[in-house]
């Protein structure tokens, strides 16, 4: 039997036996060893199998294709090309190849939609393309698909019917729309932009222009915003289906573009003006989600911005911090956000200023700087104590000025006696006791209970948070080194139940500085079966792990953020696979024995004994939790275990020493419910009993709340989807009600649905138009002489949403549009001076930190050792990247739009000046600041299967394949679990609905309420 024949038999058997994705991957390894095959032949075999089955929709098919892509066996471009070859889109229109006729009776569009959407997801998340060649190949595949869909439209036009053509088939509309989104997503990637920006791909751009010219007129009926987006793409890269009218013969000298040098030399810079909105935006960006505060980076930025003018620097950063608080109050931001802004002002800035004073030889009149900054504030927003009784409005910020001044006095920036004069009245509090980090460390070493007392004070507004954070993190490091886990457990418990304390910690330490020692301790945890009592060991291990998980889920941290550098790390394995169950035959002998022991302890014996725990280390237990739940729930669903017995066994996991394992158990359970199409009643009852337990201890209740915080958002999204599929169910709402108080746990910079709808429906052009409008308001505010005027409404979530949804290139283009407009107005003397303010604001936006790129930016100030750690990488195109691309394009841009080219050059110069390396900082020793003031001190894969022996005779091939498939199916049945690859997967729960949400959320009519929390962030 030929290789395609063997593969055809294998794939047919997989589909017939409903082999799930995990087992399919394992079987693929065997097949590739036994029978190598090219990617085109492999896809032909798979798609021909689909045609033979005559099934209109089989969710396994796109799942198998996705597995092949993820394993690197096939490329996205080849998938799209092969998919088109066998697509029923050719029906009643001229087929591209004869092969299509063979399946003309089969209906493939539902599969086509799903595969195209999977390709779009891979592109939007950075999975592909990895090379220029692959990007070009995907562009050509999209072009062919567009022509096929347009041909289908014309062949189905019937003027006697309405609607006709494209609009007569919802599935064809979905294919059409998905292709447009895929094209937009690909064009927003780094490789896609390189292809479209280069001069060497003229043939591709001509064909792409022809495809767009055919696509855009039809797109008006489908989605006007998508049409506008692709129209902008066509205009930006001149994709009109015709060869370029002229080639640029640019003179080169030693690989340097002479025209570019000449043009840039002719561009004159205007005066450097520090807009009030600049630092206002920068601080918003630092604190909008995970606190992105790195002292070296901040000092460097401020020193570059202000040079040696420290008085101006201090006055403006104080003013900006108060402006941020004022804006948050008027925007009705959450109390959690208000707390973080307030802590930055009161707890972060005073010691930060003290560090600057200690490191510079320049005398800085702090009292004058602070007085001038306070004089610029709106008295209605920050009233004095006496004014509080006269004001009818909001006085939530009445204490802030006083708190800030006392914190400054505590850090010796101003004398205590000057506070009354600066406030204009008698203060209503006394000077707090100032803390010293080293003294606090000594106190904790003497009395470990002092640590919890100090943690209680982290959230206070007395200017001591920095010293407390420094002491606590140093103690944690020491305890990790000494493996003193009893005290460490208590500290971790105190921190994990205080989410706001985690925010404050990141004002002074990076996540890596805090978590790397903890992850190292968990990875190297020593387990001795004869060590005596085991429950306390499980308790200590779980408490330390729970703090790591709280940080990870609150701030959406990546392994590099946690300080994990080894692929063998237990924590890494747990984060990647802890919520995935395993088949029984995939477990080794020790794992099988441990699983049986735990099942017996939970459901048969009187409880969890010391023998149960002594035979299984905490690391082994946590990696088995999902499988334990899978087997137990599977037994209950098949009638082998009573539900009351199941519930009683699961309740043992509510004991404090096992509670952290529920993070992975609930994650698995949520996925199982989402994947279970026919009847999820038992799983929902189990979930309700764990989310809302009937009884739990006081200590357990605190840990349980932290567990729910980490999983609530994911569970809510899954339950919403299940409720949509089963609207008559009444057992879902009680669970969602219990989760509701925990939904605000994350701080990742995502916007709210109401915000997104307001921006995307903006009359001036959707989300981009709203960003431009906000930019205009910030420039106007900076130019206004009324210095006490309240700041305009602003949240950096708007810019982040633009970057994640539309792409940095389009957001950057909108900023440049505004700069060009203001430059034109300046030349006509209608808006003199505003263009320089706008340039400063735009440069600050480009320099502002972004969570996706923060590790890369930090690496320029704190380089990692490449021999020990992988260099950090950024998964999205940032505003800095977009500026760099535009700057490279200046020679061509100067010929078509000289004014725009000038603006890009000026902006690039300003950004380069603001981001100049630390060595260029005058009169400021950054290392001394960091060291002296203790600010930011650095302190297994998929299952392997044995390959087959010598190749069997052809006559035995089919029998061998059948036996292999039968064994896999039998193993799946023996495991007693639903693989989640039934008909329900992909129907109403996958990208079929969220594709519309992507479009609607980005300039569209309706948005997904949790859109920015999805994995599709950054698609455009």
From Swiss-Prot:
Chief location? nucleus
Q: Which domain of life is it from?
A: Eukaryota
Q: Where, per UniProt, does this protein localize?
A: Nucleus
Q: Which InterPro entries match?
A: Mediator_Med5_fun
- One GO molecular-function entry: transcription coregulator activity
User: Does the keyword Cell membrane feature in the UniProt annotation?
Assistant: no
What are the alphabetically sorted keywords of the record? Activator, Nucleus, Transcription, Transcription regulation
- What GO terms describe the biological role, i.e. biological process, of this protein? regulation of transcription by RNA polymerase II
Q: Per the record, what is one GO cellular component?
A: mediator complex
The UniProt similarity line reads: Belongs to the Mediator complex subunit 5 family.
- Subunit description: Component of the Mediator complex.
Q: What does this protein do?
A: Component of the Mediator complex, a coactivator involved in the regulated transcription of nearly all RNA polymerase II-dependent genes. Mediator functions as a bridge to convey information from gene-specific regulatory proteins to the basal RNA polymerase II transcription machinery. Mediator is recruited to promoters by direct interactions with regulatory proteins and serves as a scaffold for the assembly of a functional preinitiation complex with RNA polymerase II and the general transcription factors.
Its name, as the record gives it, is Mediator of RNA polymerase II transcription subunit 5
